[in-house]
């Protein structure tokens, strides 16, 4: 029995406490006056009576009622029912104006009778009967307001003394004594919540989806806040949400109605369910981590910072469907043509229970089998039960499910386990459901009818729980008279006689004590165990669980114990791979356990090594999210298997398996300990007959595959708990002591196990104390290039591991601390006495000390073991000039994140891991070794890359499955898209590793470029003068002086600059080296007085410089394009608008530009320096290319200087005599003049082009929108599109502001395209004056900054060469590639280039002035030229393009590639690589337009970062001149300095067609227009391919074939036949070499045949030329075919310059009809096959059936010429040659086309002295051939031979 009401309280308005703001309430009276012993009086009740604040009112308000919930310190709920009414106030002296609602100032008078103060009657109870409380308080109010003749004292006394029976379904009829008759209906089970209709109301208010979101939020411990205008609705909503959680109980702050004064509680860090009134909703919307539900508006708001976990599928879908069927039954039939009569919803109380039934079913499915994962630790005196969370998640298949993981870790579930864990207790609806109905729920999930039926059955039970008696007795409660609260004269609530109430309460209590207690005996029973845990998805077992893999593991273990070493070696790699699967790992522990039982635990050294490797492989994959079963099963085995090292010294397996993170995971030890204790407690209560189990720690009741034994631990516990009350005190005490001693003994046992696994064998190398979890790209990196990678986080083990605060040296103390912490936790939870815990604490240090002492002997003896035979270190093949710096360090090449070489699911051999050595040479870092897997064979694995390409190097700690002594490792990443991840062998000391790393750094960042490998190949290295050195290098000093003198003569040097050079003579190189980059402008000032001398006045030294400059690619390209002549030349026959100036020949104008520049003819050299000031780094606009078709020009420059920057620059460097303003204005004026000169010259070109006879494509023929986007609105008023669209298109935006919109321009400008378009940065174009823009247009462009390019490159590397396999299955290669943002950057570059190309094609010139002018500018200008000019798509042209646009125009190769020490921190920026990738994209779309193939691009991409060549070493021609590498001066002692990549490519191209594109067949189109959409771009295989057989092929291809490091060379000398079949592995072999294309294969075959025949090898180009000519001669069936195959003729014309001949000469008159045949060189090479056909038809070169000289008449000029004719019966041809000795066939006649051979008569021009019978005609289907023989006999002979051939055919 329990009291209906604990306290009755009267709370009123407090007039005595003055307040500036809200009023206050005070307790006027309370009953009883003393607290009950079992229930304290609730504090702060006056706040909760008026949650909106105590306020006076001018209106008579209706009485209100709501229920407030208070929670005490013991987490007990108190339900405070508040009935509030308003009394008229008489005395207002204590009130203030601000406290009165709706106060009106009427003549300054206040009407006292109009003011009302609230008063609350509060009833506090621990029971929840809201309707009873409403009736009781209403009755007291009725007696007061209607002045009934009833004593309030008796009512209150009866209320406080009324007792109510506990749950059980009984009824209680009572009366307070005011003519009332009330009935209390108790529920059947007090564990089931009572909801009335609140749940149904909540769904009606918020909807299904919103309530499910709130449900998940509460279960995953988020903060939930309701707001509504109704306090009672808030109370109902909170109760409804909490009741949905059943069987879980909410254990965080639960405040359905929060008072205004306590709103700061919402900032609490703990989760909560709180309700507030809607008037405060503006205050709560600022909360960042609170989910807010608006009950009145039906919405919820989830902040962005909250990731709300949702129910796992399929449960989420099933729950939504079930709720929809219940709440919206008409939805299913809404679309029916003939819907049934509207089915009425269940009444609200039943609907409420149906919704709750759905959630009850949900929890039954969610917690299915939970009892099988309970771990029983103690039974007596109180059950102690632990839940094995990881086992449950693992077996449910929800290890990675966020929702269930959070639920199981929450406080609510902990309470669930402690309440429902005991196996003997009272059961309720949920216990029956989860034990017996889960299978039914699963079967019915796809049958809505059955599902609804089950839901309604459950709803009936829930309804019956709240309403057990259907026939309710009659109730009567008087209500107040209607409108009683509006009466004018109502006396205040009377003061109640407290003494009288107290007296009546005492009487009632005494009366109740005498009455017999109606106690309900709680019915306890054994809780049914229910079905075992099963996977929620019923997934099919994975591929690893196949019986075949388990058989491999079993066989391998059998071979080990039978000492069959050879069979073990064969099966071990397969067994290790199989151990990736959970079933195989379980199989291993079972098999090893069997061998322990058979007393086969003593192993020899080889067996011990194999067993350790298998154990390590098994433990490697036991993550913290797994069930820990495998590691727990291995735990006793590690102390069972051992080997004898010496008499009395044995080494156990645990010494070799310590380096796994699971041993430092306290959660693992706790779970395993509780399992062991459960087994021991079970054994304790089983009889000897039943106690028949294996000695090692089994977990039978955890594994679903095992059969349960007759009695589980829970069964025994239920039996013991049932018998416990019947046992005597002594027996009970004895059982408690037995259990405690069991736990204590297990604690000692586990302390020993932990010591075994935590104390390392070598105590000087405490690995566990300094091991961190294997990191990824970002963790703990020692980045070479930059340390700016965000989030370098060194991950550690579980925070409870005990090692986070330990020192590396004190092993014993750290181990003791860890074990002590574990012992404290488990023993306290298990109820072990403090004395036992203290004794354990004293015992642990002694155990650790003894173990360390024992291990010293083991360690000493283990070092005396003979070393395991290790693979022989293979010496790598070296390149010419390459030297080994560090001899090979023995390492293991570990697999990284790429799966290709690891076998596994992708198939193929397991090449990695590979054992070998890591070498450091002067050029490369190189690994060479052999695969560890014996079955792969004797394959050599090579992985290498140039040292200069290293972008990142970091130390790592690797979990290695092969050798336990290889842990410390190194991970090195290369910009050539390669990664070396190695673990060092135990023989490699840390000191050697440090030396290796220092040497690596030394060669990665050399002191100067002469230390790089480019200058190492047998070359003499020029000395660089450093500041501290005393020696002087004459050549450098002379050179420096030459530069200084030249600059002085040009008038370009200030006094300060001269002084600097005088002081530091010969240190120009060092000065450049000390500057990390051109971060400042060239420190050269301009003098207006002097001008540059013309070329006629050049001195001797300058003339030699000029001679060398004109040999450079820039000048040669200028000449090719016809861009003017050197200034000063007097031999100009026609006016030229551009000239080549030599003003920068000494690089005084701009250091990053070439020596010769193309500028407008009208501009004087003297004004160029002033113009240059207006541009970044003095990079003024110069012409770099001319479109030969349209005559338009492409110009480039640096970005414009901002006004402030220009002013600052000029004020610093201007001479004192010149005022700043005048100098600034002079530069500005010069810039205007220069731009005007450019415009004039460009416009002239445009006019010339317009007047010429060339037809130009009109603007409307352009691709849609180009001109529309380039014309501004000012130029073409009618056009809806502004020129800004192109900028927006390039910037990836839709809208942009237009710069040129003045009315002046609208009137002035013509409606035509501009002569010049300036593509620049939006921020800089604003500085330009509008007057400049009369005939030019500014196009704003946005582009990726260098930092974005760097970040994208890092992500691209992470995608292409990941260091580890991603743990998240969603992170695929393609997703990582997409996230890198690499393709959008390529798209932006190509899009800009295509637009510029189209503009140039259509008659307008373009100036590109972006950034500094050497990154994106170089990419765009070179790509534009490649698209527009076919010459640049040849090998020679592409070389010229790169030399001109990238090398001469000053791309910062050194800085962007971090090639030198000064650039170390700048990071790698792949600007040139992006350009090559863009070329690759174009090549993919136009494969026939390029003379070079894709391998050529890969070759350049590899070697521009390799430092193999000097070409890409420095940042400008100026620096190359400083270092003496710009010109190859033949006269100097050092004949050559370094190797040039173009020379190497030239040699390679002459030797073989390695760079040649066989498809090359250019079409005469205006410009290439590739599709630049991201979807059209392809990934470049350069990023992902590798060749493990030899390493990258880009180095070896330069050598002659005899130098190739090929494995086939070893077999060449073997006698006997060999099979030609060979397996090709894509990641191992170079597929292009092992499976060459048909043409390459034929070329190599011909070369072999030449070698066999001892013939002089013919150049492949000549052979290719003859082949293509021969293909041209093959007759075409029609004209269209002939038109389509015109390409071979162009092939010959586009051959490189060294083999160009006069191939396209006019044919002679006698051969006019055979024009194709004339395109052939004549040479004196000996006779050989002329066509490919002959290689396969005959052993002889040709089949000559009949041959001789015949005169043949030409088809065009009708001339007669003698030719040598050969009749070939085999090929059915009549071929002809120039002479009998000629090997090159000039043409042939196909005899299949011959219709007849007839004699003919003589014709004009025939040879003299020829018989008339010597003439005959050959008629074919196409034409008639006229022949003349030497005489009639010969003619007849020819006719007979030809006729016989035709007849035979």
From Swiss-Prot:
Domain PH: 1743-1847
Tissue specificity statement from the Swiss-Prot or TrEMBL entry: Widely expressed. Expressed in spinal cord.
One GO BP annotation of this record: autophagy
Myotubularin phosphatase domain span: 1108-1584
Residues covered by the GRAM domain: 871-957
Membrane topology: Peripheral membrane protein
InterPro entries reported for this sequence: cDENN_dom, dDENN_dom, DENN_C, GRAM, MTMR13_PH-GRAM, Myotubularin, Myotubularin-like_Pase_dom, PH-like_dom_sf
Region annotation Disordered: where it falls in the sequence: 1674-1694
Record-annotated uDENN domain positions: 7-172
SUPFAM superfamilies per record: (Phosphotyrosine protein) phosphatases II (SSF52799), PH domain-like (SSF50729)
Keywords, in A-Z order: Autophagy, Cell projection, Charcot-Marie-Tooth disease, Cytoplasm, Endosome, Guanine-nucleotide releasing factor, Membrane, Neurodegeneration, Neuropathy, Phosphoprotein
Sequence ranges assigned to domain cDENN in this UniProt record: 191-324
SMART domains noted in UniProt: dDENN, DENN, GRAM, PH, uDENN
Gene3D superfamilies: 3.30.450.200, 3.40.50.11500, Pleckstrin-homology domain (PH domain)/Phosphotyrosine-binding domain (PTB)
Comment text on domains: The C-terminal domain mediates homodimerization. By mediating SBF2/MTMR13 homodimerization, indirectly involved in SBF2/MTMR13 and MTMR2 heterotetramerization.
Disease tied to this entry: Charcot-Marie-Tooth disease, demyelinating, type 4B2: A recessive demyelinating form of Charcot-Marie-Tooth disease, a disorder of the peripheral nervous system, characterized by progressive weakness and atrophy, initially of the peroneal muscles and later of the distal muscles of the arms. Charcot-Marie-Tooth disease is classified in two main groups on the basis of electrophysiologic properties and histopathology: primary peripheral demyelinating neuropathies (designated CMT1 when they are dominantly inherited) and primary peripheral axonal neuropathies (CMT2).
Role description: Guanine nucleotide exchange factor (GEF) which activates RAB21 and possibly RAB28. Promotes the exchange of GDP to GTP, converting inactive GDP-bound Rab proteins into their active GTP-bound form. In response to starvation-induced autophagy, activates RAB21 which in turn binds to and regulates SNARE protein VAMP8 endolysosomal transport required for SNARE-mediated autophagosome-lysosome fusion. Acts as an adapter for the phosphatase MTMR2. Increases MTMR2 catalytic activity towards phosphatidylinositol 3,5-bisphosphate and to a lesser extent towards phosphatidylinositol 3-phosphate.
Identification of the protein by name: Myotubularin-related protein 13
Organism of provenance: Homo sapiens (Human)
Lineage of the organism: Eukaryota, Metazoa, Chordata, Craniata, Vertebrata
């Amino acid at each position: 029995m329990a009291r209906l009401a604990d306290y009755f309280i009267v709370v009123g308005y407090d007039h005595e406490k003055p307040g500036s703001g809200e009023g206050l309430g005070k307790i006027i009276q309370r009953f009883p006056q003393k607290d009950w012993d079992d229930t304290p009086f609730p504090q702060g009740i006056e706040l909760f009576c008026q949650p909106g604040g105590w306020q006076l009112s001018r209106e008579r308000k209706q009485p209100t009622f709501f229920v407030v919930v208070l929670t005490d310190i013991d987490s007990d709920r108190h339900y405070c029912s508040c009935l509030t009414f308003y009394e008229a106030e008489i005395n207002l002296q204590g009130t203030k104006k601000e406290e009165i609602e709706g106060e009106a100032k009427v003549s300054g008078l206040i009407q006292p009778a109009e003011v009302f103060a609230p008063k609350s009657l509060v009833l506090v109870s621990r029971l929840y009967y809201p309707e009873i409380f409403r009736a009781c308080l209403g009755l007291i109010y009725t007696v007061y307001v209607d002045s009934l003749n009833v004593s309030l004292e008796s009512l209150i006394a009866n209320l406080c003394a009324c007792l109510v029976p506990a749950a059980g379904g009984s009824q209680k009829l009572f009366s307070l004594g005011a003519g009332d008759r009330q009935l209390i209906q108790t529920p059947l089970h007090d564990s089931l919540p009572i909801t009335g209709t609140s749940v149904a109301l909540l769904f009606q208010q918020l909807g299904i989806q919103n309530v499910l979101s709130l449900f998940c939020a509460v279960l995953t411990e988020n903060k939930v806040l309701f707001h509504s205008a109704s306090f009672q609705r808030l109370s109902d909503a909170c109760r409804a949400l909490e009741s949905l959680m059943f069987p879980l109980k909410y254990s965080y702050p639960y405040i359905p109605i929060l008072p205004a004064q306590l709103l700061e509680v919402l900032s609490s860090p703990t989760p909560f369910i709180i309700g507030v009134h809607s008037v405060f909703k503006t205050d709560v919307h600022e909360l960042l981590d609170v989910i807010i539900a608006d009950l009145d508006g039906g919405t919820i708001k989830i902040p962005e910072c909250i990731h709300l976990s949702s129910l796992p599928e399929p449960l989420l879908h099933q729950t939504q469907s079930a709720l929809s069927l219940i709440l919206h039954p008409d939805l299913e039939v809404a679309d029916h043509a003939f819907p049934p009569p509207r089915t009425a919803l269940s009444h609200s109380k039943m609907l409420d229970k149906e919704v709750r039934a759905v959630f009850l079913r949900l929890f039954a499915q969610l917690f299915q089998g939970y009892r099988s994962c309970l771990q029983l630790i103690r039974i007596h005196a109180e059950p102690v039960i632990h839940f094995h969370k990881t086992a449950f998640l693992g077996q449910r298949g929800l290890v990675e499910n966020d929702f269930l993981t959070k639920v199981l870790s929450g406080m609510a579930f902990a309470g669930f386990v402690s309440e429902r864990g005991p196996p003997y207790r009272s059961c309720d609806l949920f216990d029956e459901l989860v034990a017996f109905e889960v299978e039914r729920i699963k079967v019915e999930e796809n049958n809505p009818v059955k599902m609804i039926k089950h839901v309604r059955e459950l709803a009936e039970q829930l309804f019956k729980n709240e309403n057990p008696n259907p026939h309710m007795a009659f109730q009567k409660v008087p209500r107040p008279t209607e409108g009683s609260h509006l009466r004018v004269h109502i006396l205040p609530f009377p003061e109640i006689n407290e003494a009288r109430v107290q007296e009546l309460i005492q009487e009632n209590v005494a009366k109740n004590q005498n009455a017999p207690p109606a106690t309900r005996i709680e019915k306890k029973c054994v809780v049914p165990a229910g079905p075992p845990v099963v996977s929620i998805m019923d997934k099919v077992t994975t591929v690893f669980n196949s019986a075949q893999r388990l058989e491999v593991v079993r066989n391998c273990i059998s071979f080990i114990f039978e000492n069959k070493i050879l069979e073990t070696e064969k099966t071990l790699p397969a067994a290790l791979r199989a151990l990736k699967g959970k079933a195989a790992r379980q199989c291993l522990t079972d098999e090893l356990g069997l061998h322990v039982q058979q007393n086969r635990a003593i192993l020899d050294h080889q067996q011990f090594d194999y067993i350790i490797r298998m154990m390590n492989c098994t433990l490697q994959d036991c993550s913290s999210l797994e069930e820990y079963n495998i590691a727990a099963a291995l735990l006793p085995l590690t102390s069972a298997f051992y080997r004898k090292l010496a008499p009395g010294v044995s080494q156990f397996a645990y010494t070799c398996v310590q380096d796994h993170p699971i041993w430092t995971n306290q959660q693992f030890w706790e779970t395993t300990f509780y399992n062991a204790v459960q087994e021991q407690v079970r054994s304790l209560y089983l009889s000897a007959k039943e106690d028949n189990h294996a000695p090692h720690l089994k977990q039978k009741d955890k594994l679903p595959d095992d059969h349960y034994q007759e009695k589980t631990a829970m069964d025994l516990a239920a039996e013991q708990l049932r018998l416990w009350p019947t046992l005597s005190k002594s027996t009970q005490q004895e059982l408690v002591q037995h259990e405690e001693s069991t736990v204590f003994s297990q604690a000692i046992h586990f302390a020993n196990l932990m010591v075994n696994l935590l104390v390392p064998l070598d105590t000087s190398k405490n690995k566990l104390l300094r091991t961190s979890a294997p990191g990824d790209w970002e963790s703990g990196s020692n980045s070479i290039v930059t340390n700016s990678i965000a989030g370098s986080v060194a991950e550690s083990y579980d925070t409870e591991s005990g090692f986070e605060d330990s020192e590396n040296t004190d092993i014993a103390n750290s181990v003791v601390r860890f074990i002590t912490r574990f012992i404290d936790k488990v023993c306290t939870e298990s109820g072990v006495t403090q004395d036992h815990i203290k004794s354990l604490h004293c015992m642990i240090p002694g155990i650790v000390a003894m173990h360390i002492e024992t291990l010293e002997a083991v360690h000493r003896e283990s070092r005396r073991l003979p070393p395991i035979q290790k693979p022989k270190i293979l010496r790598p093949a070296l390149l010419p000039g390459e030297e080994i710096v560090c001899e090979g360090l023995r390492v293991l090449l570990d697999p990284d994140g790429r799966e290709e070489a690891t076998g596994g699911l992708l198939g193929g051999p397991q090449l990695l891991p590979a054992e070998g050595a890591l070498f450091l040479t002067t050029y490369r870092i190189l690994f060479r070794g052999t695969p560890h897997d014996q079955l792969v064979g004797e394959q050599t694995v090579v992985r290498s890359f140039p040292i200069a390409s290293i972008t990142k190097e970091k130390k790592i700690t690797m979990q290695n499955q092969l050798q336990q002594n290889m842990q410390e490792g190194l991970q090195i990443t290369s910009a050539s898209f390669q990664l070396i991840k190695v673990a060092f062998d135990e023989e490699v000391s840390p000191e050697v590793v440090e030396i290796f790393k220092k040497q690596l750094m030394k060669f990665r960042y050399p002191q100067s470029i002469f230390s790089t490998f480019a200058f190492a190949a047998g070359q003499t290295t020029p000395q660089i003068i450093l500041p501290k050195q005393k020696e002087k290098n004459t050549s450098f000093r002379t050179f420096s002086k030459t530069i200084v003198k030249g600059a002085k003569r040009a008038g370009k040097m200030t006094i300060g600059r001269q002084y600097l050079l005088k002081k530091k003579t010969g240190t120009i190189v060092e000065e450049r080296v000390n500057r990390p980059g051109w971060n400042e402008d060239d420190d050269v000032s301009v003098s207006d007085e002097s001008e540059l001398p013309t070329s006629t006045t050049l001195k001797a030294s300058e003339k030699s410089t000029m001679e060398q400059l004109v040999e450079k690619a820039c000048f040669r390209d200028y000449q090719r394009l016809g861009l003017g002549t050197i200034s000063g030349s007097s031999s100009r026959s026609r006016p030229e608008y551009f000239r080549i100036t030599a003003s920068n020949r000494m690089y005084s104008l701009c250091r990053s530009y070439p020596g010769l520049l193309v500028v407008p003819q009208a501009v004087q050299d003297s004004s160029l320096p002033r113009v240059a000031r207006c541009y970044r780094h003095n990079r003024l606009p110069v012409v770099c290319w001319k479109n030969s078709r349209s005559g338009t020009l492409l110009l480039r420059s640096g970005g414009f200087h901002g006004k402030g920057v220009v002013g600052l620059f000029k004020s610093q460097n201007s001479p004192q005599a010149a005022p700043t303003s005048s100098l600034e204005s002079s530069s500005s004026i010069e810039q205007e003049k220069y731009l005007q000169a450019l415009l004039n010259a460009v416009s002239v070109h445009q006019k010339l082009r317009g007047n010429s006879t060339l037809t130009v494509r009109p603007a409307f023929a352009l691709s849609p929108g180009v001109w529309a986007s380039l014309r501004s609105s000012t130029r073409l008023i009618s056009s809806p599109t502004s020129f800004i669209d192109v900028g927006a298109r390039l910037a990836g935006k839709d809208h942009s502001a237009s710069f040129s919109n003045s009315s002046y321009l609208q009137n002035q400008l013509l409606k035509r395209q501009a002569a010049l378009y300036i593509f620049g940065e939006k921020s800089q174009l604003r500085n330009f004056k509008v007057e400049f823009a009369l005939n030019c247009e500014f196009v704003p462009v946005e582009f990726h900054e260098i930092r974005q390019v760097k970040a994208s490159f890092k992500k691209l590397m992470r995608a292409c060469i990941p260091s580890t396999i991603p743990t998240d299955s969603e992170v695929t290669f393609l997703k990582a590639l997409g996230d890198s943002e690499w393709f959008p950057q390529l798209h932006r570059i190509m899009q800009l280039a295509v637009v510029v190309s189209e503009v140039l094609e259509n008659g307008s010139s373009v100036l590109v002035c972006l950034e500094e002018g050497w990154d994106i500018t170089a990419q765009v200008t070179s790509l534009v030229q490649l698209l527009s000019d076919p010459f640049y798509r040849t090998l020679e042209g592409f070389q010229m393009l790169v030399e001109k646009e990238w090398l001469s125009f000053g791309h910062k190769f050194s800085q962007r590639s971090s090639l030198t020490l000064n650039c170390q921190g700048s990071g790698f920026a792949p600007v040139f690589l992006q350009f090559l990738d863009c070329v690759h994209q174009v090549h993919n779309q136009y494969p026939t337009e390029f003379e070079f193939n894709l391998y050529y691009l890969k070759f350049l991409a590899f070697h521009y970062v390799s430092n193999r060549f000097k070409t890409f070493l420095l940042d400008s021609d100026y620096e190359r001149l400083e270092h003496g590498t710009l010109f190859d001066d033949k006269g100097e002692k050092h004949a050559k300095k370094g190797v040039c990549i173009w020379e190497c490519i030239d040699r390679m191209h002459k030797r073989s067609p390695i760079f040649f594109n066989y498809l090359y067949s250019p079409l005469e189109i205006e410009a290439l227009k590739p599709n630049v959409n991201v979807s059209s771009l392809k990934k470049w295989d350069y990023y992902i391919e590798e060749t493990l057989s030899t390493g990258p092929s880009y180095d070896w291809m330069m050598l002659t074939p005899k130098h190739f490091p090929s494995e086939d060379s070893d077999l060449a000398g073997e006698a006997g036949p060999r099979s030609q079949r060979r397996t090709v592995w894509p990641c191992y072999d170079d597929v292009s070499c092992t499976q060459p294309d048909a043409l390459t294969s034929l070329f190599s075959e011909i070369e072999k045949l030449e070698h066999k025949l001892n013939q002089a090898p013919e150049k492949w180009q000549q052979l290719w030329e003859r082949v293509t000519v021969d293909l041209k001669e093959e007759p075409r069936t029609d004209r269209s075919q002939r038109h389509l195959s015109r390409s071979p003729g162009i092939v010959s014309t586009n051959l490189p310059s060294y083999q160009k001949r006069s191939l396209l000469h006019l044919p002679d008159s006698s051969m006019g009809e055979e024009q194709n045949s004339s395109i052939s060189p004549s040479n004196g090479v000996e006779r050989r096959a002329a066509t490919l056909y002959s290689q396969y038809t005959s052993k002889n070169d040709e089949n000559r059936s009949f041959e001789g000289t015949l005169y043949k008449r030409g088809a065009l000029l009708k001339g007669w010429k003698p030719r040598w004719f050969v009749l070939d019966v085999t090929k059915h041809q009549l071929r002809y040659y120039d002479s009998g000795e000629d090997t090159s066939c000039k043409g042939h006649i196909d005899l299949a086309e011959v219709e007849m051979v007839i004699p003919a008569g003589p014709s004009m021009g025939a040879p003299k002295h020829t018989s008339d019978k010597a003439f005959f005609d050959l008629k074919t289907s196409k034409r008639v051939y006229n022949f003349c023989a030497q005489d009639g006999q010969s003619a007849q002979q020819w006719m007979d031979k030809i006729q016989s051939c035709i007849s035979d055919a």
